[in-house]
Amino acid sequence: MTSTFAPTPLTQRAAWQALAAHYEQIREIHLRALFAEDPSRGERFALEAEGFYLDYSKNRLTDETLRLLSVLAEESDLRGRIEAMFSGEKINTTEQRSVLHTALRAPRGATVIEDGENVVPEVHAVLDRMAEFADRVRGGEWRGYTGRRIRTVVNIGIGGSYLGPDMAYDALKHYSDRDLKVRFAANVDGSNFAEVIHDLEPDETLFIVCSKTFTTLETMTNAHSARQWCLAALGDEQAIAKHFVAVSTNAAEVEKFGIDTAHMFGFWDWVGGRYSMDSAIGLSTMIAVGPEHFRAMLAGFHAMDEHFRTAPFERNLPVLMALIGLWYNNFFGAQTLAVLPYDYYLGKLPAYLQQLDMESNGKHVDIDGQPVTYQTGPIIWGQPGTDGQHSFYQLIHQGTKLIPCDFIGFCQTLNPIAPHHDQLMANFFAQTEALAFGKTEAEVRAEGVADWLLPHRVFEGNRPTNTLLAERLTPEVLGKLIALYEHKVFTQGVIWNLDSFDQWGVELGKVLAGRIIPELESAEEPELAHDSSTNALIRRYRRAKRQN
């Protein structure tokens, strides 16, 4: 199916060509000069919305840059594409699906139409069932097979069925029930499962198996290992229904596994895995923090959805961050984006955003199936501050690669232990200042540094950063933050003319692995028909495996 959204190829659009010319004019301008020319730049190039303060003044851009980027968004029919998504059009063209993760956080009573039906009542029916179940587990009403209270919840899932809940559990740990632990089994590596269950009691453990089809290889391998572990300790098939629930739509397989389908929580084809943490996939999150905090997170998601849908582009947080990112990706040739949260609880945010961004926009053909002639999604990486300052910040400051950075911080800490937070935030502010303005040779020389050491002590500066500041990390703020990045990724995908909601790139490796598994398990020497490298690796593995 072809797209009707972008009839003119991206690089032929007037705004793109104007941006290319504009880049040549300002590419060498230093942030020192931009701030010297405009003493109010720090206030002018900032946006306050939805509880966030975005300072984008330390970016290598001008008013004209922003104007041209906004025109590019208009030429890409961004407003039309936003409405198409929110209204349930099948904008995931390769899979012929609507993209309605925004419906997961729509308030009760809202109307979101998909294939002629309002999906909101069903969304809230699932949320209500989740809340009832979460309260039973948290309150001790739900008991294990031997009558003991559940002390640990293990989420079994991979990809979007793991990264979102894992990130959210850490992010909201301050709000969680500390007497109830949540762990995650994702990797098919048996060591992951072994460590997850290492010190657990089967009769105090609840497993949530997250797989829409209930056939996902990694998830079901871990689920069956968990089932065997429970049965070995409890000795009765009837125990499975007390220690397993499912997030799935395949009732037949769920029931076959031994799970009561009354404890199966569904979600829909219009929810992509990487956009599903606020669906039933978030059941472990709801159990950890409680329904009230989970619903507060949903309210945050929805508030950012409405901001994205209604705010003009120049006052729109996701659009502005998307356009700035595109400016570096497509004109400065930056290949990565560092996400640097200065909050311990957001330690897993970079890994979550890796999947969100790289699986969405890591595409080499456009929505019409044509090869792109420009760079698409960046590499996303990062680590919490101040840890990263003592590892990779050296390269950002003095290396040869341009690495735009998103700094995320909070004015109030959830754990006021003096003087920790002031020291943390002093580093937060200092890093963006140092990256922007650096340290000149004259400044270093004035400190009495020896001539031979001067080149090593100079900081070029002109390293671009966004600073995203909020009051404090709450469930609502987390929802807003994740929705901000969701819509940022969507905006960039629209301009690049991509289908940001499929992920065919993950399929080929899975298919090949399915062929190789019997070759590794076979008692007889298999006849291999791979390339010479893969054949040799398989034979070496089989020899070493036999010696174990």
From Swiss-Prot:
The active site is at 359 (proton donor), 390, 510. One of its GO terms (molecular function) is monosaccharide binding. It holds the Pfam family PGI. GO terms for cellular component: cytosol. The keyword Phosphoprotein does not apply. It comes from the Bacteria. It is found in: Cytoplasm. Its EC number is 5.3.1.9. This is Glucose-6-phosphate isomerase. It comes from Gloeobacter violaceus (strain ATCC 29082 / PCC 7421).
